[in-house]
């Protein structure tokens, strides 16, 4: 700790970030890492044995293709086959008509690149068009390097082998030989979430970060999509399993903030908690066996009173409704999402995005051709790879690409100077490459915030030491050229994306926050009674809220990187947005607490109060886009009915009013000390 205390704060934060990313425990990460690691070693062995060129491209196919489960890997493999046909076909057409005419070649390749970048943003299968764009721009370097059309044709045909044999390899490893099924991952994930819930139910533990809770909830939803596509039994009983996922998510997220020491430990409460933990354990065993859980537990009056006293009645009711649900309930037909974005042909940002990418590539190509520097062809690839919809995400990708390239170049330099002179055969080479590929695979299977570093590190290392050589290489120029090409592409892209039609999310962020608060107002309008349809709707909207708050959090991080904005305005926007996100999460959990009390108080006043809260929240959300939102001030009248039957309900709703009052005032020029103090009071 003393060493960390002496380091600058940004360095400590960076080390904490890498520690979190490298130590992340995600279901399927270890099998995915092993598959990727073994696949890389096999690619090196096959490419060196049969002298197949472009080994870095083969490694890139593996890193993009091997996914966390067998179904996803198979789906991406099919996309890669389609992409290979499209990209090689487009290259041959370009060469056929314009091989000896660079200007005409660019005139033909330009619209192809623009079309691919446009479809990458607007089409569901954007990955296919991204691959076509990469090869279309990379293929323009072949005629510049070689004066013989026959050799260029052979290299282009080799690209088919280079793209398809790693695809076959990853299909054999990840789908046929050592598959990691989504259904098994789902069962394990549900059990892990229930384990965490039981721990917080029985012991006083510190709550996990809300961002982690939201990521786990989103991971369950993604696994549910894969299970629906990959498992017939899951599809047959999909209504029950989807309800199970929603229930587990609710129990996990709600009990995360639960503290059993906050309530009196009467004998009735202790016995009820034990009974509830026992039912959750039964659900775990059923899920582990892939069976739909059925419960015969019927809560009696004393148990209901104990549940209400310790704020567990709503969790108990959601669990019981799942246990009494018919496994053969027909699923609700899901609406098929459109293949294209709804505003694909009306929003000018998509076409501007394609034009900006083309402009960056043309600038790099002009420089690359003008200086006749063959080794920096990676500058054009960089322009396509770092092209993202907005300035913040583009900067994120630039940092990841530069960081990965820097690490890969350093490893390549050390490898060439210290290791390469001592190698005599392919076996020794594989033993030396194994730890490098293992590190790259582990980083590449982390979260989206850092995974690209692993991919870029391995690809840069391979470009500098293994590309088109089948024996020892001692040329340090390759390392320099590849790294400089990436730096040039990054600088050009940064300038273009910052000053040419910059897509800032500063205006989108308040709208995103308004959408999240709008969903929260819908939650408040749902009747707080034990009715099956209302409760299921409540659970589904809660999952949507997790996704909405997580998306707002990520957007805040991207807006923080938009240096073209005024620093004070950017800091104020981020501070207000983070306060809204934090208060929104607290409001959701506070509203959960009111359900336990409101269910026992069945009178006409409760919908009126809920509507009052929802109206105030909707009014606040409506003013976010124009920065006219003020902190809602709500006053509740004490009613004899609520005070006589459940005095805790009024206290819970008054706490909701206090959270409303702590929402930031967007009309003020800056955050006031009182607001900051109110924020701290909620921690």
List the predicted regions and their residue ranges:
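Long, hydrophobic alpha-helical segments that serve as membrane-spanning/inserting helices
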Residues: 1-34, 41, 49, 150-151, ...
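Pore- and pathway-forming membrane helices of multi-pass small-molecule/ion transporters and channels
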Residues: 9-18, 33-74, 84-89, 106-173, ...
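Membrane-entry segments of alpha-helical transmembrane domains in multi-pass membrane proteins
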Residues: 26-31, 46-52, 74-82, 97-104, ...
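A cross-kingdom feature marking solvent-exposed beta-strand/loop segments within repeated
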Residues: 42, 74-78, 96-101, 147-150, ...
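Alpha-helical transmembrane segments of multi-pass membrane proteins
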Residues: 61-62, 354-366, 376-387, 402-414, ...
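Juxtamembrane/interface segments at transmembrane-helix termini
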Residues: 125-129, 175-188, 447-451, 477, ...
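C-terminal functional regions that serve as terminal interaction/effector modules
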Residues: 418-419, 423-430, 434-438, 446-474, ...
């Amino acid at each position: 700790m003393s060493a960390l205390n002496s380091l600058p704060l940004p360095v400590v934060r960076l080390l904490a970030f890498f520690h979190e990313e490298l130590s992340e425990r995600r279901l399927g990460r270890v099998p995915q890492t092993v598959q990727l690691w073994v696949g890389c070693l096999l690619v090196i062995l096959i490419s060196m044995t049969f002298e197949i060129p472009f080994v870095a491209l083969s490694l890139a196919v593996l890193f993009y293709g091997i996914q966390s489960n067998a179904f996803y890997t198979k789906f991406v493999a099919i996309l890669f086959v389609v992409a290979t046909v499209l990209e090689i076909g487009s290259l041959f057409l370009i060469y056929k008509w314009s091989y000896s005419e660079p200007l005409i070649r660019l005139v033909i390749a330009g619209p192809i690149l623009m079309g691919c970048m446009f479809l990458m943003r607007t089409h569901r299968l954007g990955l296919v068009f991204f691959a076509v764009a990469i090869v279309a721009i990379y293929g323009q370097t072949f005629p510049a390097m070689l004066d013989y059309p026959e050799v260029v044709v052979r290299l282009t045909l080799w690209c088919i082998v280079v793209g398809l044999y790693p695809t076959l390899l990853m299909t054999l490893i990840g789908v046929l030989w050592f598959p990691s099924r989504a259904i098994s991952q789902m069962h394990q994930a549900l059990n892990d979430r229930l384990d965490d819930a039981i721990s917080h139910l029985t012991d006083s533990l510190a709550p996990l970060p809300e961002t982690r809770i939201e990521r786990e909830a989103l991971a369950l939803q993604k696994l549910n999509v894969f299970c629906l596509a990959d498992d017939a039994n899951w599809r047959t009983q999909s209504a029950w399993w989807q309800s199970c996922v929603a229930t587990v998510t609710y129990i996990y997220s709600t009990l995360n903030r639960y503290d059993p020491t906050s309530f009196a430990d009467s004998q009735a409460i202790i016995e009820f908690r034990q009974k509830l933990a026992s039912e959750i354990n039964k659900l775990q065993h059923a899920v582990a066996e892939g069976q739909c859980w059925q419960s015969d537990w019927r809560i009696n009056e004393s148990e209901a009173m104990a549940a209400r006293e310790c704020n567990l009645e709503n969790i108990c009711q959601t669990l019981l409704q799942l246990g009494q649900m018919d496994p053969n309930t027909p699923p609700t037909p899901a609406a098929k999402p459109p293949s294209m974005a709804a505003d694909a042909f009306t929003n000018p940002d998509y076409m501007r995005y394609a034009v900006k990418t083309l402009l960056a590539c043309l600038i790099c190509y002009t420089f690359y051709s003008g200086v006749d520097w063959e080794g920096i062809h990676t500058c054009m690839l960089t322009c396509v790879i770092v092209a993202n919809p907005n300035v913040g995400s583009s900067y994120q990708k630039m940092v990841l690409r530069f960081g990965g390239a820097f690490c890969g170049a350093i490893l390549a330099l050390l490898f060439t100077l210290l290791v390469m002179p001592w190698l005599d055969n392919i076996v020794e080479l594989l033993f030396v490459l194994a730890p490098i590929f293992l590190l790259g695979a582990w980083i590449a299977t982390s979260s989206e915030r850092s995974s690209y570093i692993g991919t870029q590190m391995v690809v840069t290392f391979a470009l500098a030491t293994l590309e088109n050589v089948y024996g020892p290489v001692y040329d340090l120029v390759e390392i320099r050229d590849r790294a400089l090409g990436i730096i040039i592409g990054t600088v050009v892209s940064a300038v273009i994306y910052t000053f040419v039609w910059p897509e800032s999310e500063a205006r989108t962020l308040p709208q995103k926050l308004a959408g999240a608060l709008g969903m929260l107002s819908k939650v408040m309008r749902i009747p707080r009674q034990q009715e099956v349809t209302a409760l299921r709707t409540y659970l589904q909207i809660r999952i949507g809220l997790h996704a909405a708050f997580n998306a707002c959090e990520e957007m805040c991080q991207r807006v923080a990187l938009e240096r073209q904005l005024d620093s004070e305005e950017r800091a104020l926007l981020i501070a207000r947005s983070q306060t809204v996100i934090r208060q929104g999460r607290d409001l959701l959990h506070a509203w959960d607490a009111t359900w336990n009390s409101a269910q026992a108080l069945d009178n006409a006043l409760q919908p009126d109060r809920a509507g009052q809260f929802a109206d105030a929240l909707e009014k606040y959300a409506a003013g976010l886009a124009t920065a006219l939102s003020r902190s809602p001030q709500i006053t509740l009248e004490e009613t004899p009915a609520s005070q006589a039957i459940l005095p805790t309900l009024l206290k819970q709703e008054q706490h909701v009013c206090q959270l409303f009052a702590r929402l930031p005032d967007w009309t003020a020029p800056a955050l006031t000390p009182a607001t900051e103090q109110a924020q701290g009071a909620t921690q």
